[in-house]
Swiss-Prot record:
InterPro entries: Kinase-like_dom_sf (IPR011009), Prot_kinase_dom (IPR000719), STRAD_A/B-like (IPR047173)
Positions of ATP binding: 64-72, 89
Tissue-level expression: Highly expressed in heart, skeletal muscle, testis, liver and colon.
Domain of life according to the entry: Eukaryota
Gene that specifies this protein: STRADB
PANTHER family: SERINE/THREONINE-PROTEIN KINASE FRAY2, STE20-RELATED KINASE ADAPTER PROTEIN BETA
Major localization class: nucleus
SUPFAM superfamilies in alphabetical order: Protein kinase-like (PK-like)
Protein name per Swiss-Prot or TrEMBL: STE20-related kinase adapter protein beta
Amino acid sequence: MSLLDCFCTSRTQVESLRPEKQSETSIHQYLVDEPTLSWSRPSTRASEVLCSTNVSHYELQVEIGRGFDNLTSVHLARHTPTGTLVTIKITNLENCNEERLKALQKAVILSHFFRHPNITTYWTVFTVGSWLWVISPFMAYGSASQLLRTYFPEGMSETLIRNILFGAVRGLNYLHQNGCIHRSIKASHILISGDGLVTLSGLSHLHSLVKHGQRHRAVYDFPQFSTSVQPWLSPELLRQDLHGYNVKSDIYSVGITACELASGQVPFQDMHRTQMLLQKLKGPPYSPLDISIFPQSESRMKNSQSGVDSGIGESVLVSSGTHTVNSDRLHTPSSKTFSPAFFSLVQLCLQQDPEKRPSASSLLSHVFFKQMKEESQDSILSLLPPAYNKPSISLPPVLPWTEPECDFPDEKDSYWEF
């Protein structure tokens, strides 16, 4: 059976499952009413892209990233009938073993069914010979990880962190309500559109708590995670014992991601897996700026002044000269302070005991996100450089797509990860 033969093309809505009741008495002092969020329907132009499965309708512009253990190339492309910029993920299915094929199949199916503004959408999926093409909206700001590398090497401001985490946790809450564990929450799986919309990607790592119509309290699926993912994983997932893990494992990853956004570095990145597990198990939750859990470096990166980080690669924008940016606008003080509310959120997420961590729904009601009621979606745009999202801007010359004959670059050199 083909990878694409297993799901219905009617785009049936998945009915949300009732989440388990959680005990949150220990965090009530930090909770407020949950903010609301509206979502508009896709534009007519986007609807045309949704229906386009003709490979000749897409002009590949430039590769903007790698993913899926370096088996997938991610390209900026233009949908020629409408002029819409899109993202295309191209994977050679012949290079995928059975486990990877199942992961791809799962990601395609679940993205097809999920309908939430904070979950990355697959507009169209089709095959070109043995190559799988996945068409998604172009996220002009790329990933939060890319923003860190290019503009915020010493970490983001608390206001920007709040905007990014709020969208990510809303998407995560939707997944949890539908009985799914993401298992790969991190900055490189948080994408930002040119309109300031934050979405979660990385659905190939997702696992369902529902089996045979029953929602289980824990799962015992322990895949061979890439070492690049392990710093974000919870202690219970790394332990791989008889207790298993559940959706609270993702909450731990949210806490690590918050530390990543605050410091500009990935906690535990240079540690051996055993040392990492011991470090995560040994004591109380970590501070977002606890230097003992971050890789040591003799020198820190400086804010880039060479071009706008648009999500298509800084070198492309430098050569084309389409934008410039005022570095003062993106300046982050080297001596940063964070509010008690932010420290509280991180500490709650990083509790060793999963039962002591809040649910995603409760996390959205944390006082740290209270200001999101007053802030509009445009507020995140005021904290970022101008986005590269106008189809009228000239792009590098394109060539017809052909099957690659050379080896791909190392995944570690890529800023985008899907």
